[in-house]
Swiss-Prot record:
Name by which UniProt lists this protein: Sodium/hydrogen exchanger 1
Gene that produces this protein: SLC9A1
Region (Confers pH-dependent PI(4,5)P2 binding): 540-545
Transmembrane segments: 99-121, 131-148, 159-176, 187-215, 223-249, 253-283, 288-322, 329-341, 351-371, 374-404, 411-438, 445-469, 476-505
Stretches the record annotates as Interaction with CALM1: 633-818
Species: Sus scrofa
Chain residue ranges for the region called Disordered: 39-76, 739-818
Amino acid sequence: MLLWSGICGLSPPRIFPSLLVVVALVGLLPVLRSHGLQPSPTASTIRGSEPPRERSIGDVTTAPPELAPESRPVNHSVTEHGMKARKAFPVLGIDYTHVRTPFEISLWILLACLMKIGFHVIPTISSIVPESCLLIVVGLLVGGLIKAVGETPPFLQSEVFFLFLLPPIILDAGYFLPLRQFTENLGTILIFAVVGTLWNAFFLGGLMYAVCLVGGEQINNIGLLDNLLFGSIISAVDPVAVLAVFEEIHINELLHILVFGESLLNDAVTVVLYHLFEEFANYDRVGIVDIVLGFLSFFVVSLGGVFVGVVYGVIAAFTSRFTSHIRVIEPLFVFLYSYMAYLSAELFHLSGIMALIASGVVMRPYVEANISHKSHTTIKYFLKMWSSVSETLIFIFLGVSTVAGSHHWNWTFVISTLLFCLIARVLGVLGLTWFINKFRIVKLTPKDQFIIAYGGLRGAIAFSLGHLLDKNHFPMCDLFLTAIITVIFFTVFVQGMTIRPLVDLLAVKKKQETKRSINEEIHTQFLDHLLTGIEDICGHYGHHHWKDKLNRFNKKYVKKCLIAGERSKEPQLIAFYHKMEMKQAIELVESGGMGKIPSAVSTVSMQNIHPKTLPTERILPALSKDKEEEIRKILRNNLQKTRQRLRSYNRHTLVADPYEEAWNQMLLRRQKARQLEQKINNHLTVPAHKLDSPTMSRARIGSDPLAYEPKADLPVITIDPASPQSPESVDLVNEELKGKVLGLSREPGRATEEEDDDEDHDGGLVMRTKEPSSPGTDDVFTPAPSDSPSSQRIQRCLSDPGPHPEPGEGEPFIPKGQ
């Protein structure tokens, strides 16, 4: 009654997960028995005097195995009549050993699924504690319950982990890998994965060897190679733990791909170091040849795994070309070829994780072009489901195996391992980031460095590698396993639970949940082509150049072999537009918005439909003239500052330009021309009305030169619209003043009136000229001795510079021949 009243007092959101846990634990009761359902000792004692009963298998009656054929009771009356004794047909029978293995597997998977449902039903728990932490706690509780009833808890075998639980998680990560972010940051990822892992392994192994020398009698017998082996196991960042934590905090794409990419690509380093130190530990003496071979094995393991993955990816893509009539089996090829790539790599002791990633990345674009939309949906959801279940089982069995395993605790060794792991991670990230930022355009800020260092989580890969150690060759493997479990629990619980509040506290940029529109995708591709052209012009071949080369090779050769039909010949931009338009149409139909579709013909339609012409409407409002002038001024002022060289750009790597000296001379001439133009602008008169900008004037004159015919009696500026930015495109035509306007016969008052009339009626840019000065004199007006006073006053008036123009208002007008 007390239990029932306690359950009734819970709120509905808390009752549901509690019932799920109870149902799962009740389902696990048969597993708690050692070998299925067996009678209790009391029952067997009571029935001890009775002979063993016969067990029926189907419709055949068999005698118990402990009775010999001679000791069977014989019914003489039945024998005489030639009849055999028969039992009644068994209506109900129990044979747990027959279904034990699949039944227990199903129960564990059911427990994992119920736990995931229960955690997300209570939002207060899932928002504070990561799912991986809760799953480990459930594993600890289940393992403790199994051990409390006197049974041995199941242990996470390394073969089960590496062959069945890990491949789905890596395949899901490799198949849906954000390829653009991965390739743009591949150099940074490789430095963190290779150099960072080597630093952690040797730094941790060397310091732990020093600790063992002064740590006491229990750990004095651990040698240098044993400590280096232990450092190689514990140094690698675990992809399962990183995925479980980073997907919940929704960190930005850059940090996510850096940490997750490091956890994927450090597998080759971990495998090589593990096998290398495991072999060296059995040698009496390690020579230079062994070290060189170990160094070469890194390239064999990593590049060999990539090669195996690429081969299986190409085969999978080629096979999907012929599945147009059998759509049902299309998803199966993706799973089988990927899994065979992993097994083939493990067969030759290559990196299976690298093989899975390479196969998923290579096959995806070609397979998705060949298979149907339903098959693509099946692949997506099956991979997500498979990887989620595997991840849940890994964390649950990690908790159960902690209870089931044998441990050897040493405070000095365990605490030193935990402390040195944190120090090595921080120092490695800081040092490598300082080096990487010298070559990156987008620098890694101190906040980014903190998240990268804090996100170096350890997980089940280190636990399984520690469990693989042979106790005969490594007597201290129990101590290693205890230290590994301590580091895993600290990183998952402490760092995993505190990383979300720290991200919010530091205001780290989060991932954008909204997808990019068609406009953004098209402009992104346009910018890629533009940057490729810029790299070709300056001779700096970056990743845009090689990406363009690879795309051209892919379009010219690979697509024709791996993609069926006309899809291989379709331009990428048009194919993407078709895909996005179809996606939007499907979403519109599913949302019930068909009544709002306009009656305009689609450009994708294959039918020749001629609808009624609809009145064209301007989507965006027209900009005002003031706003347009403001934008032009901003562009003119800022486009001059784009002549900057990146830090990764080195002019000494370019081919020597024979025209560089001529270019420098041209720049000097332009600088002198600008100085001359500043002097000329001082002699410009200001019209009465507001003038258009020089850019608008050039455009107007270039479009219709006859409509703006200048006056014949004034000096004008002739503009060549074909090349407005060339110094030779502007010519100053000085026409002689008709009838010697400035002569003595003209009166000063009349000259002033004519000048005012010219300023009122002129709509263009007018330049007044003065008499050329003699050589060796400056531009200051000096009257000649023969000039009359009226002529001197007129020329002094004309030489008045007037008000200066606003800075940055017009573009320079450079006279020809200066």
